[in-house]
């Protein structure tokens, strides 16, 4: 009997209290890291929509420039969804930018330079990114916000 007690004392291992303390420490660390990781995920999503908006703006500007080069001097270029009446379609822009056509919103031209894209809206996953060529009061050309319901 005494030998069994001595054998139990020689066993190495963690007590239940030590294991609970480790679990509590891990829970505290997880609680501190979750908000920080959520912030990084939101920033990454914003950067992704800005990147896709930038690709869409470049694709639209490229197609508008090509269409303008084929027209007479002083003629205007139109963007729309009807290939028969519009010079550039949103589908062509989406194909060139490799984005879904449903994500492309309103596109407007500069009033002084009718071949320059002035604004473009791009919506994805509940967020809208608005490109403004010449922002006033702000130096940001790409602004991400919650999607507006129209």
Regions found by a protein language model. Give the residues of each.
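Extracellular/periplasmic head regions of type IV pilus-like filament subunits
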Residues: 72-132, 143, 148-150
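N-terminal leader/signal peptides at the extreme start of proteins
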Residues: 1-14
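Residue-level signal for short amphipathic helical patches enriched in basic/charged
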Residues: 11, 29-32, 44-47, 51
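Aliphatic-rich helix starts adjacent to a transmembrane/signal segment
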Residues: 37-57
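Alpha-helix exit/C-cap motif
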Residues: 58-80
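N-terminal single-pass transmembrane signal-anchor helix
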Residues: 12-38
């Amino acid at each position: 009997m005494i030998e069994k007690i001595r054998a139990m004392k020689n066993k190495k291992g963690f007590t239940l209290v030590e294991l609970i303390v480790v679990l509590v420490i891990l829970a505290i660390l997880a609680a501190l890291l979750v908000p920080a990781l959520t912030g990084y995920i939101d920033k990454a999503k914003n950067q992704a929509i800005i990147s896709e908006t930038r690709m869409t703006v470049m694709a639209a500007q490229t197609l508008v420039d090509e269409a303008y080069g084929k027209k007479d001097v002083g003629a205007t270029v139109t963007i729309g969804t009807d290939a028969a009446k519009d010079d550039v379609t949103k589908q062509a822009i989406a194909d060139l930018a490799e984005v879904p056509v449903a994500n492309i919103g309103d596109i407007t031209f500069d009033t002084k330079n009718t071949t320059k894209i002035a604004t473009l809206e791009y919506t994805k996953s509940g967020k809208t990114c608005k490109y403004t060529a010449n922002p006033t009061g702000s130096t940001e050309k790409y602004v991400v916000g919650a999607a507006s319901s129209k």
